[in-house]
């Protein structure tokens, strides 16, 4: 319930400093998302290995005839917790850092995370970046925003009050997404695929021009 959520958040805020509250809530939301990914009508049951496949294992979300039902209060939460903790440790290894225990007060490595449109990076000065690493979308191959909604609605419930600027809308923004999505251009007198491709190419051109400015 909403009252229970507020109480639990107040418990965290009373016990930990703000940065740690944000970190703990973020990790808990990732565990919750993984639980939903493994235990929904969109997850596929694989009888050969007696296991379930994640709903997001493919590039689309589809209802399954055969789906798993896992007890959320038993193995599911601990299984997903172990996966998230393992991923965190691997990321720390990748950047040559040690996983931070909850009582660590200071560390000398910092990372800045910003939420912004790739074609309007106003917070980055001209010629101030050494390298830009990106995995851009390719036309209509994957509808990222539609897939993101599967996780976004749960994260918004957990993190909406902690990171309000990241969860301003009920669902993800489909109009500004740089993909070719024909469903946005139906009944316009021109084949929707053609309009979707033009929209995608225009957005990608603006994005790469902005990246060039920053380099």
What are these regions (language model features)?
Residues 1-125, 141-193, 204-207:
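Nucleic-acid modification enzymes, centered on SAM-dependent nucleic-acid methyltransferases
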Residues 132-133:
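Hydrophobic beta-strand segment of the Class I
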Residues 137-138:
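Conserved phosphate/anionic-ligand binding catalytic regions in large, soluble enzymes, centered on
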């Amino acid at each position: 319930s909403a009252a229970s959520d507020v109480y639990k958040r107040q418990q965290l805020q009373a016990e930990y400093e703000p940065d740690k509250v944000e970190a703990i809530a973020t990790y808990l939301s990732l565990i919750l998302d993984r639980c939903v990914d493994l235990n929904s009508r969109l997850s596929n049951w694989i009888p050969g290995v007696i296991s379930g496949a994640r709903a997001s294992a493919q590039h689309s979300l589809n209802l399954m005839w055969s789906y798993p039902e896992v007890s959320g209060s038993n193995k599911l939460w601990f299984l997903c917790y172990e996966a998230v903790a393992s991923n965190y440790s691997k990321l720390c290894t990748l950047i040559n850092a040690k996983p931070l225990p909850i009582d660590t007060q200071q560390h000398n490595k910092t990372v800045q995370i910003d939420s912004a449109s790739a074609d309007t990076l106003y917070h980055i000065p001209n010629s101030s970046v050494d390298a830009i690493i990106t995995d851009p979308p390719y036309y209509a191959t994957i509808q990222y925003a539609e897939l993101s909604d599967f996780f976004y609605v749960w994260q918004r419930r957990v993190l909406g009050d902690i990171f309000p600027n990241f969860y301003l809308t009920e669902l993800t923004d489909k109009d500004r997404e740089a993909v070719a999505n024909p469903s946005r251009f139906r009944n316009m007198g021109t084949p929707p695929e053609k309009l979707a491709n033009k929209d995608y190419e225009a957005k990608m051109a603006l994005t790469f021009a902005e990246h060039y400015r920053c380099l």
